[in-house]
Amino acid sequence: YKSDNVPKNTVDLTDSQWAVIKQGMRQMVSDHTSPSALINQINVNVAGKTGTAEEDTTRPDHALFVSFAPYENPEVSVTCVIPHGYTSGNAEELAGMVYAYMYDPDKLDTLDITGNNQMSD
């Protein structure tokens, strides 16, 4: 596959600036996601950023999660977007399943899929 798309512009960041961004993404997963969450139970360190996007006040927010792994030497990026997915935790949970499939498939055997249908703020 060859794409003819060309970036419109780029952002020049120093290596230390990139390191801070990547460290923040790792800390978001390791420090701000439950230790019992699948994404923190698999045999790979994931770095990521959650987010939501509001379409209007009468429908649930869209759930977003962008990520990469392994944190120490990235091989893959997983991005999950769930239209009207309520909260970014749902997109993060889905990404955790993808990483488990890739790096620790035995974790999927006992997975309890419940979802989190809480409304975002």
Residue ranges, per PLM feature:
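Active-site beta-strand/loop architecture of penicillin-binding DD-peptidases
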Residues: 1-16, 22-109
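Short, highly charged C-terminal tails/helix-capping segments
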Residues: 109-121
